[in-house]
Amino acid sequence: MAEAVNNEQQGPQFNIQRVYTKDISFETPNSPAVFQKEWNPEVKLDLDTRSAKLADDVYEVVLSLTVTAKNGEETAFLCEVQQAGIFAISGLTDQQLAHSLGAYCPNVLFPYAREAVGSLVARGTFPQLNLAPVNFDALFAQYVQQRQAQAEAAGEAAEANA
């Protein structure tokens, strides 16, 4: 019986220790002139994730969102949010850990970042902005494929030079 309890404790563990805003910025470089024009924006979303090991089985993951809205040729607003979290993760293979840090944790952080962006845009008196959900699993799979292709290309180049 005690052996079964130990096996359960040794299984995969995932705990959110903290979710917080690491950095936030909102700029309206062409105000107040931007408010005098018809509103027909082109909105661009750039996102990035990074992770760092803080201690054994404890990681910080930072999701960075940059939203740029242009109205014609002028930038209406630029919103930058770094939403971070501290996660305790153990009992995973290296591949599972990489997926957790690169896809699952950003999925946890994205709703907080999306809310922060929406709030900043509203405080700037711009029309409501609702960011569409992001498929971090697909983005992570694409990243893994790119890394594999780069590794294969590097291996082929090394063989050609040998």
UniProtKB/Swiss-Prot annotation:
<keyword id="KW-0963">Cytoplasm</keyword>
<comment type="similarity">
    <text>Belongs to the SecB family.</text>
</comment>
<dbReference type="GO" id="GO:0006457">
    <property type="term" value="P:protein folding"/>
</dbReference>
<dbReference type="InterPro" id="IPR035958">
    <property type="entry name" value="SecB-like_sf"/>
</dbReference>
<keyword id="KW-0813">Transport</keyword>
<dbReference type="GO" id="GO:0005737">
    <property type="term" value="C:cytoplasm"/>
</dbReference>
<dbReference type="InterPro" id="IPR003708">
    <property type="entry name" value="SecB"/>
</dbReference>
<comment type="function">
    <text>One of the proteins required for the normal export of preproteins out of the cell cytoplasm. It is a molecular chaperone that binds to a subset of precursor proteins, maintaining them in a translocation-competent state. It also specifically binds to its receptor SecA.</text>
</comment>
<keyword id="KW-0811">Translocation</keyword>
<comment type="subunit">
    <text>Homotetramer, a dimer of dimers. One homotetramer interacts with 1 SecA dimer.</text>
</comment>
<dbReference type="GO" id="GO:0051082">
    <property type="term" value="F:unfolded protein binding"/>
</dbReference>
<keyword id="KW-0653">Protein transport</keyword>
<keyword id="KW-0143">Chaperone</keyword>
<protein>
    <recommendedName>
        <fullName>Protein-export protein SecB</fullName>
    </recommendedName>
</protein>
<dbReference type="Pfam" id="PF02556">
    <property type="entry name" value="SecB"/>
</dbReference>
<dbReference type="GO" id="GO:0051262">
    <property type="term" value="P:protein tetramerization"/>
</dbReference>
<dbReference type="GO" id="GO:0015031">
    <property type="term" value="P:protein transport"/>
</dbReference>
